[in-house]
């Protein structure tokens, strides 16, 4: 079983989701725990258009309901642990807030990487 952790700010964002979306995200996290990097598309994917440096290119998005949820959890792998850095809307739902969530995830996960390195 793979370990999945939330950055504290991402945990706060998760708590703000409607209950059905929190449940869908919990189910997606459970799949990530079971399958780790073997979790196939459409349950996860690379975040497209992220070109802010080598570390940020490894940013992934967890896609609840196989991508049918309007929410995403943005994460990165650190060894045997996945850390969710932010929770935000899907890009086609709200591009501005999606970009903000991606930027926040990158910044938070870069901080985590500095601590674990």
Language-model regions, residue ranges each:
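Basic, Lys/Arg-enriched alpha-helical interface segments
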Residues: 1-70, 78-82, 89-117
